[in-house]
From Swiss-Prot:
CDD domains: Sulfate_adenylyltransferase_2 (cd23946). Heterodimer composed of CysD, the smaller subunit, and CysN. HAMAP family: Sulf_adenylyltr_sub2. It catalyses: sulfate + ATP + H(+) = adenosine 5'-phosphosulfate + diphosphate. The keyword Nucleus does not apply. This is Sulfate adenylyltransferase subunit 2. The keyword Transferase applies. Pathway: Sulfur metabolism; hydrogen sulfide biosynthesis; sulfite from sulfate: step 1/3. One of its GO terms (biological process) is hydrogen sulfide biosynthetic process. It is an enzyme of class 2 (transferase). With CysN forms the ATP sulfurylase (ATPS) that catalyzes the adenylation of sulfate producing adenosine 5'-phosphosulfate (APS) and diphosphate, the first enzymatic step in sulfur assimilation pathway. APS synthesis involves the formation of a high-energy phosphoric-sulfuric acid anhydride bond driven by GTP hydrolysis by CysN coupled to ATP hydrolysis by CysD. Belongs to the PAPS reductase family. CysD subfamily.
Length: 302
């Protein structure tokens, strides 16, 4: 990797660490969202660097939908034990009681109940006034126009037409009681940046990002992995073993794999250098209606 590229990644690293430290100093009760994916892994690594050799001074929060890949949950618990950070796990109790499922209730309702409402419950329960997220501007058009410090009102809603100006590296974190800020330290990173940084820093990731033979079914133009016996097959669907990996991770019935032979980090980086589509194309929740992601973000989704 050439020196110019290394310098670019160091600049991104420095910017993100600056943002993380600013939030820790400025807010009374911040939290870092931990979705277990590649961006969360990078953000956690940056937080550890920001306060090394001390402990991360805020907890991590995982909003568990009960439908994540098994390997994600295993990785989450293993990582928490390895680094000893304070991990909070929240499941929407109403959603669990009603048996909320992407198969029964559909992607939109499942996401709203288990992710959006679950997140708002957790933020209210613990009284967090700032929440870090790993979203990047290159992922999706509604995220492209969101600020690094993204203001949320008392109902956790976002108004894209009423965002605060951000001049250079000056961020406005003033909030009234009950209001909060969503903070995105990786805003200026790209998917390629993330993978090159993971490679350079030897950051652990969920094995699902690497190609392997996995059982999948083709549904709505996506390859859905059969992760457990709750998978409901539709008429005519056949489970096949294919060499696939995931560019993005979420609830397994709503996350599409891509056919790939990239079973190493260098292989993934080589794929990223020629990729022409966003990783979010593999997320069913982004396509369940027009303007889907922006609508979800307005309602309180990350």
């Amino acid at each position: 990797m050439d020196q110019e590229r290394l310098t670019h990644l160091k600049q991104l690293e420095a910017e993100s660490i600056h943002i993380i430290r600013e939030v820790a100093a400025e807010f009374d009760n911040p939290v870092m969202m931990y979705s277990i994916g590649k961006d969360s892994s990078v953000m956690l690594h940056l937080a550890r660097k920001a306060f090394y050799p001390g402990k991360i001074p805020f907890p991590l929060l995982h909003v568990d939908t009960d439908w994540k890949f098994r390997e994600m949950i295993e990785f989450r618990d293993r990582t928490a034990e390895k680094y000893g950070f304070d991990l909070l796990v929240h499941k929407n109790p109403e959603g669990i009681e009603m048996g909320c499922s992407p198969f029964v209730h559909g992607s939109s309702k499942h996401t709203d109940i288990m992710k959006t409402q679950g997140l708002k419950q957790a933020l209210n329960k613990y009284g967090f006034d700032a929440a870090f997220g790993g979203a990047r501007r290159d992922e999706e058009k509604s995220r492209a126009k969101e600020r690094v410090y993204s203001f949320r009102d008392k109902n956790h809603t976002w108004d894209p037409k009423n965002q605060r100006p951000e001049l250079w590296h000056t961020y406005n974190g003033q909030v009234n009681k009950g209001e909060s800020i969503r903070v995105f330290p990786l805003s200026n990173w790209t998917e390629l940046d993330i993978w090159q940084y993971i490679y350079l820093e030897s950051i652990d990731i969920v094995p699902l990002y690497l190609s392997d033979k996995r059982p999948v079914v083709e549904r709505d133009g996506m390859l859905i992995m059969v992760d457990d016996d709750r998978m409901e097959l539709q008429e005519g669907e056949v489970i096949e073993e294919k060499s696939v990996r995931f560019r993005t991770l979420g609830c397994y019935p709503l996350t599409g794999a891509v056919e790939s032979e990239a079973n190493t980090l260098t292989g993934i980086i080589e794929e990223m250098l020629v990729a022409t589509s966003s990783e979010r194309q593999g997320r069913a929740i982004d396509h369940d209606q027009s303007g889907s992601m922006e609508l979800k973000k307005r309602q309180g989704y990350f």
